[in-house]
Amino acid sequence: MIYQSPTIEVELLEDNIAHLCFKAQGSVNKFDRETIDSLNAALDSIKQDSSIKALMLSSAKDAFVVGADITEFLGLFAEEDTVLQSWLEQANVVFNKLEDLPFPTISAINGFALGAGCETILATDFRIADTTARIGLPETKLGIIPGFGGTVRLPRVIGADNALEWITSGKDQRPEAALKVGAIDAVVAPEQLKPAALKMLKDALIEKLDWQTRRAKKQAPLTLPKLEAMMSFATAKGMVFKVAGKHYPAPMAVISVIEQAAQLDRAGALQVEHQAFIKLAKTEVAQALIGIFLNDQLVKGKAKKAGKLAKKVNSAAVLGAGIMGGGIAYQSASKGTPIVMKDIAQPALDLGLGEAAKLLTAQVKRGRSTPAKMAAVLNNITPALDYAPVKDADVVVEAVVEHPKVKSMVLAEVEQHVSEDAIITSNTSTISINLLAKSLKKPERFCGMHFFNPVHKMPLVEVIRGENSSDETVASVVAYASKMGKTPIVVNDCPGFFVNRVLFPYFAGFSGLLADGADFAAIDKVMEKQFGWPMGPAYLLDVVGLDTGHHAQAVMAEGFPDRMGKTGKDAIDVMFEAERFGQKNSKGFYQYSVDRRGKPKKDLDPTSYELLQAEFGEQKAFESDEIIARTMIPMIIETVRCLEEGIIASPAEADMGLVYGLGFPPFRGGVFRYLDTMGVANFVALADKYAHLGGLYQVTDTMRELAANNGSYYQQA
């Protein structure tokens, strides 16, 4: 053994080829400070052994190296610039040391080689991957850029255009795509990976392969004609800004870094990368996006933990077909859990199966599936007009019409047809789980399972714990949601649960602005372009359906009359009474037509303005800051109330619920990250300015206390 540490081992193989193996004690290899130090020491040991003629890197895990240890980032990024600069320089000394070894080197890549893992393989002369490999630099998704030479080496290996596409998108690449652009040299079956890597090294040793020219190219300026470079970078800036927009600076920074470093050697190019990395690491966007990543890991960790307590789900059933039932059936079947889709009407079953088939056909068209896989998924969905096929289901998802009496009747009915230990859930957005539980003989096996529409696109599932729900029931539903490819968060029962409870105060703030004469289109523009929501409140209500919104608003008003009760008509009432239900009947706040691609197209409609003006009087203009304050303050305070009341367990889960369930702007990180960034004291002062607008604008005593102590929510957590 040449070198050994808890994360890396180096041994000598035949023909004096050294083998450096990443073998962390956890489930995956990642570059924390300890691993970087170990790699440095391992490379020193290799350099000191004059018998070594070549080096192969590999992994003992299912993935090569998944990236840097992101849990270290927030603390590290809070340090002074000089500390960050020193960290980057020290790490890059190690990667340069790997690249500068006096003999050929190769990476044998299996599974993920992302971020720092990708930067590791770029530092070797050759790269060979097996068919499981996924390679990429996802740092822009965290609001930063690669920091260990990724922006320097990748353009010199695969060309500037390809590198810009890889790094700005942050997507990982399949081995075939990586081979096509020259990021790797060969793709082999997993069992052939190490033999093929050793063969390449031996060919390099007898000069069949020129490793020295390859290495020199990586360390030299980019060979890009000046005019071509200007055109290439200018085009990239336009295309990337169109996708990333002004709220996400990292993708644009990538272009600037590669452009500035194009005519520099390795040392100069790395300095450009370091400076840009440090600047981005200090941004609120990076803090927010890294926070989301860490929150996502926390939620997934909880789901994994729940799996240990969960009842195994081998088969499922959904009651109620149609679009929602079809979406749930598709999601379950496509992730490997067979499901019965039961309805009382054949047309509804046809619609549900049609929805699943439509989603699968789209996957095939995009090349993400095959006709054979599509057929297998459809075979996993069993349509039924009676309960006979439901009897063996481990989990039942009731997804009938949103009406308490209908749901209660169906729940009581299905309980008679399933096994004693089958879990029963209700997909409801507004109806109390405790109320529905009364229809069951065994309420301990019941909880809520709230999917968001469209099911195949929305990552969140709210798992709602009723007062009688057992821990096993909740854990089993969390595990099932996770198996379906969803992100489950557990919330306690209350009107609106978590997501809708915090959404409707936002709509109330919007309605208040309209009552005071604001233009709904102007509000949408501010909330989309400035705050960063994917849809403004008027557009969102049209998509959700103003009939649905009207019903949910009434539920919220009944549940929280002091804050959400109404004394007169609001804009939602006006649209509902005029039977303007949104996209579903082509008229809401906006009017809708179908474009050439069959997608809904929205336009302004004079009728909407006439209806609102008749109820609320003449329009007047509002400043952007006031629009943002009056819509967001109620949502933020209600989110805090949910945490204080134990409806949601942590700031992390609340923020994930908002980002995944509502599309809260990721670059803001969620309500609690937004509050911490703004400063709780600053928020309290802002809310007090609008306190005269009513209970939704009244901050809690705990918020005032936290503000007085200069505290923050994530610091507490």
Swiss-Prot record:
Pathway: Lipid metabolism; fatty acid beta-oxidation. NAD(+) binds at residues 324, 343, 400-402, 407, 429, 453. GO terms for molecular function: 3-hydroxybutyryl-CoA epimerase activity; delta(3)-delta(2)-enoyl-CoA isomerase activity; enoyl-CoA hydratase activity; long-chain-3-hydroxyacyl-CoA dehydrogenase activity; NAD+ binding. Heterotetramer of two alpha chains (FadB) and two beta chains (FadA). NCBIfam families: FadB, PRK11730.1. PANTHER family: TRIFUNCTIONAL ENZYME SUBUNIT ALPHA (PTHR43612), TRIFUNCTIONAL ENZYME SUBUNIT ALPHA, MITOCHONDRIAL (PTHR43612:SF3). This is Fatty acid oxidation complex subunit alpha.
